[in-house]
């Protein structure tokens, strides 16, 4: 994710990366809240403005910086370390078995994405950070339960002109009928990320929602923002994703653990 909590910035300080990070990032100092106007329900009005990070929580700010940049920072730290550690690319998880009596109980089979050759790795532990369709989670016998229907969001990083007063603040906006928006300014002082509520997704409408264009998502955003608007000059990146209300029935085994989106 592109949002980095202040306590996570503290962790980056241990790697000597915090100052570089906060010099480049957008600082989320305040958050504003907008709701439907009580007298004109089709319009929105500001209803609140709060400090984003409570006093005394951290010496560092909550910041926004592109995930690829964080990746670059960490790769640079690894390259300068004593071991000159480097990640392996072009491998995908194939299978996992556990022999509880062995010194290295975990045996993981990896498949090369080019050519399909298999590699075997033996270890004491394995941590699966392989996303919502986690192969590690399945291999340690864990399953997901919860609501099969997800909630869809359109997300755009845009260069745009807007008369919305809080365009350069993190803003949570709820309209009476058109849905919701979360605005998060990006680093650099020009781009803004726009999260647009696209509603509940099920088997009947999933294809239609996933097929929405960026122009249609922008139209929805403008309906939410009324009486304000955005005029998008350039969209540098956009996507549609779903958030499901699910949770795994367990996070770990004797020698295996799932983490992050692999648990949801």
Residue ranges of predicted features:
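Short strand-connecting beta-turns/loops that link adjacent beta-strands
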Residues: 38, 70, 101-103, 115, ...
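Active-site-adjacent segment of FAD-dependent monooxygenases/related oxidoreductases
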Residues: 3-81, 88-90, 99, 175, ...
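Conserved mid-domain beta->alpha element of the FAD-binding
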Residues: 74, 128, 235, 242-264
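Short, hydrophobic/aromatic-rich segments at coil-to-beta transitions
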Residues: 103-108, 166-168
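Conserved FAD-binding catalytic core of PHBH/FMO-like flavoproteins
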Residues: 76, 125, 129-244
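Flavin (primarily FAD) cofactor-binding/catalytic cores of flavoenzymes
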Residues: 91, 110-115
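A conserved short coil-to-beta-strand element within the FAD-binding core of flavoproteins
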Residues: 89-106, 241
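Core beta-strand elements of the Rossmann-like FAD/NAD(P) dinucleotide-binding domain
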Residues: 114-125, 129
């Amino acid at each position: 994710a592109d949002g980095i909590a202040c306590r996570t910035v503290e962790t980056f300080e241990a790697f000597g990366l915090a100052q570089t990070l906060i010099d480049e990032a957008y600082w989320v100092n305040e958050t504003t809240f907008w709701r439907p106007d009580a007298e004109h329900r089709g319009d929105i009005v500001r209803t609140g403005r709060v400090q984003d990070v409570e006093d005394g929580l951290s010496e560092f700010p909550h910041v926004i910086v592109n995930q690829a940049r964080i990746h670059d920072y960490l790769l640079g730290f690894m390259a300068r370390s004593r071991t000159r550690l480097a990640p392996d690319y072009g491998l995908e998880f194939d299978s996992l078995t556990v022999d509880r009596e062995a010194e290295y109980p975990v045996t993981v089979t990896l498949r090369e994405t080019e050519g399909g050759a298999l590699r075997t790795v033996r270890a004491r532990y394995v941590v699966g950070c392989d996303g919502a369709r986690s192969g590690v989670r399945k291999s340690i016998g864990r399953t997901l339960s919860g609501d099969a229907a997800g909630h869809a969001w359109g997300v755009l990083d845009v260069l745009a002109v807007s008369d919305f007063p809080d365009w350069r603040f993190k803003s949570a906006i709820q309209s009476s009928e058109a849905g919701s928006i979360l605005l998060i300014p990006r680093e650099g002082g020009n781009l803004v990320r726009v999260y647009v509520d696209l509603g509940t997704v099920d088997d009947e409408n999933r294809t239609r929602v996933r097929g929405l264009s960026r122009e249609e998502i922008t139209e929805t955003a403008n309906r939410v923002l009324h009486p304000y608007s955005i005029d998008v000059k350039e969209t540098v990146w956009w996507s549609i994703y779903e958030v499901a209300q699910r949770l795994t029935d367990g996070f770990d085994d004797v020698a295996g653990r799932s983490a992050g989106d692999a648990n949801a």
